Amino acid sequence: SVGATENILTAAVLANGVTVIDNAAREPEIVDLCNMLVDMGADISGIGTDRLTISGVEQNQLHSTDHEVVNDRVQAATYISAVAVTRGDVFIRGARAGHMEMLINRFSEMGVGITPQQDGIHVSCQGRLRAIDFATLP
């Protein structure tokens, strides 16, 4: 779970010794959190994999950093859905197409136009949506 991985990860940064998280969540939000913590002085390896290894550091080893939090994929998906059902035309600033490839592919199959741009995605839907088959995974 994303929340469980975030909680263990943040606690492990200041814990004594080494903490290993097996089956860690690999969502973009976890990668983003890891990168921010490393920028702050944390010792984390395996970023982007399902096995994170965190070597605890002393609190005085951590420092501030400038960081822009990755945009919320669920919120972007909600906006895409709203555009689809209202046949709208919207630019979602900050949305990262690379974090939503499967979702974008499915909406495109349904007839929603989604164009990745440097600072977000352009979403438009003018016609009637097409039905598609899909399956969810754990």
Placement of each model-derived feature along the sequence:
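Short, structured segments at the rim of ligand-binding sites
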Residues: S1-P138
